[in-house]
């Protein structure tokens, strides 16, 4: 795993998206990504505004929203991202042939490539998924975009392990600029070959151990000590009557302190 600071890594990274995110994390002193699986744009924007000061990244599943609209969902979200200095990650999990994902990413109702700084994809269909998404990103926006490959998942019984995970890592080596890292539970290596992949880990919780639907939670210290750069927290921030401002501050502090311990610094 990397023991360099986010600031050091930002200066040397190949990807403009990764450079921006790492620099933001260093400046804002947060490695927290808020995962907001809610059904209305109003709730999404309300939580984004409350959690914004605590996060480096906001993760959406816009196909859950019953009232999605570019003008009333995306544009206000972008304004909040600018206000609070966080980036946007649409958790689309693309998993089709190159031409299909190119269209899914750039077209349709959501036009994800126009507004999401980061998205992600499965490797099951082969490297064409990377090529298709990269082509769409270039056509849809003047802003740089980044891709995370799904190497491991946090759900019980996931098939994303072993040879599959190793294959996804090899696939990521085909593109040093667009592929910025992985959704994974641990460090994926690559530094010996000149890669500095960001590791983002879902299923992080300080209280719950599971949800009864296969999700398995690990602690902040566990994942960061295993190589996680960004902790992804969802329901732990706002579910079950939790105060998102209080929980955002709590997870932010826990994540940052775990990171400082990993790089040998103290708060």
From Swiss-Prot:
Matches recorded under Pfam families: OMPdecase
User: Which residues does UniProt call coiled coil?
Assistant: none
Any single GO BP term:
'de novo' pyrimidine nucleobase biosynthetic process
Catalytic-site annotation from UniProt:
93 (proton donor)
Q: Which residues bind substrate?
A: 37, 59-61, 91-100, 217, 235
**Entry's PROSITE patterns?**
OMPDECASE (PS00156)
- Please give the family membership noted in the entry: Belongs to the OMP decarboxylase family.
Which GO terms label this protein's molecular function in UniProt? orotidine-5'-phosphate decarboxylase activity
Entry keywords, A to Z:
Decarboxylase, Lyase, Pyrimidine biosynthesis
According to its UniProt entry, this protein's organism is: Eremothecium gossypii (strain ATCC 10895 / CBS 109.51 / FGSC 9923 / NRRL Y-1056)
Q: Which InterPro entries match?
A: Aldolase_TIM (IPR013785), OMPdecase (IPR014732), OMPdecase_AS (IPR018089), OMPdeCOase_dom (IPR001754), RibuloseP-bd_barrel (IPR011060)
What NCBIfam families does its record include? pyrF (TIGR01740)
Q: What is this protein called?
A: Orotidine 5'-phosphate decarboxylase
The signal peptide, as residue positions, is none
Q: What class of enzyme is it?
A: lyase
Q: What Gene3D superfamilies does the record point to?
A: Aldolase class I
């Amino acid at each position: 795993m990397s023991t360099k600071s986010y600031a050091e890594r930002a200066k040397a990274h190949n990807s403009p998206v990764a450079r921006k995110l790492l620099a933001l994390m260093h400046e804002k002193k947060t490695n927290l990504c808020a995962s907001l699986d809610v059904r209305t744009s109003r709730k999404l924007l309300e939580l984004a505004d409350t959690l914004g000061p605590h996060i480096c990244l906001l993760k959406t599943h816009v196909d859950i929203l019953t009232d999605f609209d570019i003008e009333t969902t995306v544009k206000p979200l972008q304004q909040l991202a600018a206000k609070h200095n966080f980036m946007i990650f649409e958790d689309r999990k693309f998993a089709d042939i190159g031409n299909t994902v190119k269209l899914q990413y750039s077209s349709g109702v959501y036009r994800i490539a126009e507004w999401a700084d980061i998205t992600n994809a499965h490797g099951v269909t082969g490297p064409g998924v990377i090529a298709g998404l990269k082509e769409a990103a270039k056509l849809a926006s003047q802003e740089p975009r980044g891709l995370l490959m799904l190497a491991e998942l946090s759900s019980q019984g996931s098939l994303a392990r072993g040879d599959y995970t190793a294959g996804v890592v090899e696939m990521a080596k085909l593109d040093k600029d667009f592929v910025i890292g992985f959704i994974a539970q641990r460090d994926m290596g690559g530094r010996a070959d000149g890669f500095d992949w960001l590791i983002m880990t879902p299923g992080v919780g300080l209280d719950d151990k599971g949800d009864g639907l296969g999700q398995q939670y690990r602690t902040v210290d566990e994942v960061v000590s295993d190589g996680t750069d960004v902790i992804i927290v969802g329901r732990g921030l706002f579910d079950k009557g939790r105060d998102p401002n209080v929980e955002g501050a709590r997870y932010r502090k826990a994540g940052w302190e775990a990171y400082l311990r990993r790089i040998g610094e103290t708060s």
